[in-house]
Regions:
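C-terminal effector/interaction modules appended to NTPase cores
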Residues: 1-170
Length: 170
């Protein structure tokens, strides 16, 4: 989805977090070679809908949905890539989708949580927790800006259930 700005064939774009290297995560810079919206090819698209973006990238880089959850923007304009994050937390009274009225228990350190940040989903392991905030180490990095909402899910009865949300702090 294009949520902000415009994109045209020939534009230079940056993809973050990018790809994993032996030095960490490296953004990918490439050019837009084609744009498709609906069933038609376009030269330019504006925010407000789903867009297929063709690039000059080797298909091996994008295999197995390895770019899932990545952000695209003009080089140098995207938020930072985070491998650890801190957020203010608001837990729900009851876990969504559980049978009965499953109360949400307080968060615990080292408890795996599923965190959804924009279109990125990753496992977060809490390092420090108190009733108002959480600091977590992420299994996969995310590209996110301060103030962004993060959905927090916990594994209950072998399934992930929404238990609250957080607001990203820097």
């Amino acid at each position: 989805s294009l949520i902000q700005g415009e994109l045209a064939v020939g534009d230079e774009i940056e993809i973050r977090p990018g790809r994993k290297t032996n030095r960490g995560w490296e953004p990918i810079v490439t050019n837009v070679t084609s744009l498709h919206s609906g069933s038609s090819e376009r030269k330019r698209v504006a925010a407000g809908g789903l867009v297929a973006i063709g690039t000059g990238l080797d298909p091996a880089i994008t295999k197995s949905d390895s770019m899932l959850g990545s952000l695209i923007g003009r080089p140098g304009t995207l938020p930072p890539v985070l491998e650890k994050l801190r957020m203010d937390v608001q837990l729900l009274d009851r876990a969504v989708g559980t049978s009965g009225s499953q109360q949400v228990e307080a968060l615990r350190t080292k408890e795996p949580l599923m965190l959804t940040v924009g279109t990125s989903t990753t496992v977060g392991i809490p390092i420090q927790v108190n009733e108002k905030w959480l600091e977590a180490s992420l299994k996969l990095p995310v590209c996110a800006a301060e103030g962004q909402r993060i959905a927090i899910s916990r594994r209950i009865d072998a399934r992930w259930h929404l238990i609250g949300y957080g607001i990203l702090q820097t």
